[in-house]
Amino acid sequence: MAKEKYDRSKPHVNIGTIGHVDHGKTTLTAAITTVLARRLPSAVNQPKDYASIDAAPEERERGITINTAHVEYETAKRHYAHIDAPGHADYVKNMITGAAQMDGAILVVASTDGPMPQTREHILLSRQVGVKHLIVFMNKVDLVDDEELLELVEMEIRDLLSEYDFPGDDLPVIQGSALKALEGDSKYEDIIMELMDTVDEYIPEPERDTDKPLLLPVEDVFSITGRGTVASGRIDRGIVKVNDEIEIVGIKEEIQKAVVTGVEMFRKQLDEGLAGDNVGVLLRGIQRDEIERGQVIAKPGSINPHTKFKGEVYILTKEEGGRHTPFFNNYRPQFYFRTTDVTGSIELPAGTEMVMPGDNVTIDVELIHPIAVEQGTTFSIREGGRTVGSGMVTEIEA
């Protein structure tokens, strides 16, 4: 019998497992793929065992090595891409670099332990990098005889989530055992199916990139005699059409306005360019020296130039090619946003004297030129052209 072909009509959602080491994230990932393969067999739903997920391949994202396992599966309603990272450092890097863009996550907490230090850290990181929807899976309930103890652990988790501005009282908490489900215990398999129903219902469908406001980072600029100035780059999000009014934002204090008079891709004229396309846009009324690499072309009013922001950053270790020594307050590296480097100074949090290679920390940054940034914009920190850190804007300050 022919395998059914990949069904693009199902909404696609990115999720992941987060939580403290050894609380069962990878076992749960294996259980989800295995139970779905048993209950909803399809070409997509293939069982993955613990070992294959745990042997996550190394990837490089903006100069940083990260181990990440990607599995896919589907429910009756949706297609999921699921990210699981084996080590704690891999999670931190994944989230801060934006390598793992999760629409929602399953927070795994062992009922035998309750919340632990990394549970807290992963909740904080989720809050910082904009993962808005968490579902709790209390794992290993088969090892706890005392019903009251389970209630206490659940209360503790809910309080912790509320502390970081998640709706701790209202978000779903599912109690089960990933290992028992993996072993084929039907009671615990049912709970995995209940978990997936909850993920279907509770984590909203993400807004498609093409529905977001236009953002096109300018990579190159040239002029075509008799026609005007062309800016080229890859459309980050949104759509650009001929006759659109746009704004040119960043590097300079003032925002310039222009009208798109042509869109082309691979030297062919288009009516519109979509998120992901590499395009050249012809701009009316803009001189060759009025637009430069590092600026962005954006939907009017959608993004502004800023010089001050808070960021959550990960600093590379020496082994990853980063610094060999710590840095201190007023460290002045380059911040690489999309297509350009801008010098900026770093202010450390009160009470933090220095930042060591391998640390993650919240910093205040002040750039020497304004750049088009918003909450969620990612950046690299560089010194003399080599990457020494990676970060994400968590709050705009000026």
Swiss-Prot record:
Binding residues for GTP: 19-26, 84-88, 139-142
Enzyme type, top EC level: hydrolase
Residues that coordinate or bind Mg(2+): 26
Keyword presence, Metal-binding: yes
Keywords: Cytoplasm, Elongation factor, GTP-binding, Hydrolase, Magnesium, Metal-binding, Nucleotide-binding, Protein biosynthesis
Location(s) in or outside the cell: Cytoplasm
Recorded GO MF terms: GTP binding; GTPase activity; translation elongation factor activity
tr-type G domain mapped to chain residues: 10-207
UniProt record similarity statement: Belongs to the TRAFAC class translation factor GTPase superfamily. Classic translation factor GTPase family. EF-Tu/EF-1A subfamily.
NCBIfam families reported for this sequence: EF-Tu (TIGR00485), PRK00049.1 (NF000766), PRK12735.1 (NF009372), PRK12736.1 (NF009373), small_GTP (TIGR00231)
Protein name as catalogued: Elongation factor Tu
Species this chain originates from: Streptococcus sanguinis (strain SK36)
Gene name as annotated: tuf
